[in-house]
Amino acid sequence: MSSREIRIATRQSALALWQAEYVKARLEQAHPDLTVTLLPMTSRGDKLLDAPLAKIGGKGLFVKELETALLEGAADIAVHSMKDVPMDFPEGLGLYTICEREDPRDAFVSNTYASLDQLPAGSVVGTSSLRRQAQLLARRPDLQIRFLRGNVNTRLAKLDAGEYDAIILAAAGLIRLGFESRIRSSISVDDSLPAGGQGAVGIECRTADADLHALLAPLHHADTALRVTAERALNKRLNGGCQVPIACYAIREGDQLWLRGLVGQPDGSQLLRAEGRAPLAQAEALGVQVADDLLAQGAEAILAAVYGEAGHP
């Protein structure tokens, strides 16, 4: 078993390749006799760059091709950004490892202004996320939010070309790719609650491959997994994907988890908030509880309108 080859399915973006290389290095460090190779591939979400994610519709935009490689035996594991991973897995696959989380916050990036508060009225801000858009406009309704897709390098290039006064990106991606100096300020989770799983890397593999599960065990970070479990349970209860205005963030407080959740109108006119605390062993139940609080406040109507506009259930 120690001489086994592990084939990693990964997207081809710089950030996805960084994540796959990170997993490769961790595996080789834990198991020096292991041979680890990367299988880069293009996902549907990578091909459809001319429309907002919410308009494209469907879940698993960035993972389906990788899962197909696992099911067909072409790859042994798939490495994902946890915020892109759907709640449900194809039969025969599962999520067995969640690596330690990087900074989960959103980052404010601008060549002119140091923070969101410094932006003049009417400034153009780029983001592809309805979650970020809702929270930005709730705080600053005087801003113009403009569609922004593409990988990290592409988005930074568009900012540098003067298409935007500022852009909002995940801090984790910038840090991992060596662009930490481009972050003018990290936005507090109080002002921009992150997406579920943001900053965490997950490893998916075949459920029947028990030997592989054991090889992956040293990469698993229990605290991150507990937090992400609560966040994903909230998302699942709300039937959310990575392209809807749902935010959630859990932190550990001793022997308890504190989970905050949010559902927002994309125009920022309404933000529904809920939070809860529970023992660590009840992470999943906590996610459902906070989601139910949001549903009781009217979250379903907001999300139904978003899905209806996007043309998918």
Curated annotation (Swiss-Prot):
Its required cofactor(s), as named, are:
dipyrromethane
Q: Name one GO cellular component term.
A: cytoplasm
Which pairs are disulfide-linked?
none
- Residues modified to S-(dipyrrolylmethanemethyl)cysteine: C242
Which keywords label this protein?
Porphyrin biosynthesis, Transferase
Q: State the function annotated in the UniProt record.
A: Tetrapolymerization of the monopyrrole PBG into the hydroxymethylbilane pre-uroporphyrinogen in several discrete steps.
* Designated name of the protein: Porphobilinogen deaminase
Q: Which organism is it from?
A: Pseudomonas paraeruginosa (strain DSM 24068 / PA7) (Pseudomonas aeruginosa (strain PA7))
